[in-house]
Amino acid sequence: MKIFIIKIILVLFNYVLLSYSINQDLNILNVYDVRFAQTHVIPIEGKSWILNNKTYTLTIVGNRDSLLLVKFIDISITGTSSIKTVTTKTTKEEIKATILTNTYNVMVWNNDIVMGTRLLNDPNQLPPTESNGEQYSNEHHSIMIPKEWVKPGMKLQFFENSNSFIKSSKFIFPNVGQDYTLKMWTLPFYLFGANDTNTRPFNQTKNIDDSISAGLSQVYSCSNILSLNHPIQRVDWPYLVLGPRNGLPGMLITNSDQKKDGYAIMEGVLNILTGIRVAFGESTSSIQIYAPLLHLGANGKYADTYGGLGGSSRGTGDYRYSDTFVHEQGHAMGLPHAGEAFASGSYPYVNGSLLGSEWGFDINHYEFLSITLSNTSKNYKGCEKKNVKDTQNRCVKQSVMQSGAGDRSSNYLFSMFSDFEMSIIQNYFKNSIYYDEQIGKYKKWNETIGSYYEYKPITKDYGFYRLDDGIPIERDIDVYTIVFTYSLVGPEPLSQIYPLLKSKGNLIRQFDPTNKTEMKLITPNTGSIPWYCFNSGCDYTIRVTYDDDSIKHILLQQGKRQYWKPMGDFKLNFNDPTSSDSFLLGVINVKAIKTIKKVELLETLMAWNGISKNSKLLTFKLF
């Protein structure tokens, strides 16, 4: 009898537990497929890839207006529904999962602070697709979330408003990452007599106009874009010295037709941009620099670049800020050619296409972007002969980094990158040093805690690469930028001091080879910065003479030594005119507190031992 009573009690207890569980479920609003649309429509947890044993992760960018998308499932005992139901069985009840189109709110939190509430739009109000294309979804509710709410620590809770009692979801935690501004300098190069009249006026080349910046902000994964003319403003030079390249010796050219191949001038300009970034203390920053090339051919008329070149935070090409520009700045942020990357196993989508990438979204047009070509695309006609196809035999877009420029719809300035490429761009910004102008301090991003922290620059690797993380010791001061070349084997025209560039710029730490205390710091193996001269030696010095005959010496972190042998043998090919070992390009900034009247390049072998007043003069220029 006791056993029977116990069994009855257990049955009743289990029934109560089940009923309680069901009722508890009924009070929970069930959500799924929650997504954020920025450059791409991605799950709130982000998206990851593992390629060649390396993990790539795309997250939601902080401080960027975003479209929130969500589907709802309502679980009810009654099973009432106006749309299809999915039925499951339990031992006691039949529960129907119903996809509804009720009215819903979302409350956005940041940690324990409520940022605000938004009423979600019904699925029939979802933004359209470019060129009236296939609808992205007919089930997602959506709403724009202001950028101020999109930050690490974000959490979402959804509420159903159609029942007699309020039903709420569990908290959902979007994976929000770094917020950052893509700051971009533009520095037009007017070469070989090019000017505002015979090419393009400076007011059209000095900066990216607002409409183009707005378009760029939708294809690059960033919080916003800040495009500014570089402090140097413009470069006007009648000649350009090209270093040895592709087995050919260096040369001085005075028109674009003298170049030996299509990329020679662009490579020369990129190398100068590298020096400018270093001289301005931006080598470890995420600041981009792009140089529109305006040069004349042998006929004295504008010669198009017909392409571009980019990498390592620099880019150059034509002045139009269009397809070439967006592609080269992709290289500048670390993106390779997508087709080549796929072949090497470092890009996930076949032949550099977008097959497998998430759809895109453009907030300016308020449209979704399909991964397939629209019928308004320039490349739509005949695409079946060259483009990758999806399962419905539709042409799939190519990445911007693999011949995809013409795949965009006709009313768009730029075509699409893949979602994977955005993860590379995000990683590029994570490792950079930022200057906070409001507080006058440097900061870096800490991904673990999801915030910036104050960063104090230090000299790493015993000064092998740079001092003080390459950061300026003085900012926003008047400077002269000195650009020079020197050939160890000649001819003489390859050794040049370019016309000076004056601007409001920055100054990095430098050493004076006439100062014994400073030279003691960089003496190989014994100084406190013992590897400063280990890359190629410290064998050259710039001597600047001002108009009052005062003199300044700046030791260059450049030499003619073999790698890791600052006191050892010269480079193996220093006498070969076709080798880069025989050529020197340098860029430094000096204070413009006085007018410069002469710049000299001196040979000062192993300068930490001190330099002679009669050091060998290699080249000079009077101003």
Swiss-Prot record:
Catalytic positions are E328
**Coiled coil feature spans:** none
Compartments annotated for it: namely: Secreted
**Signal sequence coordinates:** 1-21
Q: GO molecular function: any one?
A: metalloendopeptidase activity
The cofactor binding remark recorded in the entry reads: Binds 1 zinc ion per subunit.
Extract the Pfam families matched here: Peptidase_M66
One BP term from GO = proteolysis
- PROSITE patterns assigned to the protein according to its UniProt record, in alphabetical order: PEPTIDASE_M66
Top class in the EC scheme:
hydrolase
Please tell me where Zn(2+) binds in this chain.
H327, H331, H337
Acetylation: present as a keyword of the record?
no
Keyword line: Hydrolase, Metal-binding, Metalloprotease, Protease, Secreted, Signal, Zinc
Q: Which family does the similarity line name? A: Belongs to the dictomallein family.
PANTHER family for the chain: DICTOMALLEIN-1-RELATED (PTHR39540:SF1), PTHR39540
Protein known as:
Dictomallein-5
- From which organism does this entry originate? Dictyostelium discoideum
The gene designation is dtmlE
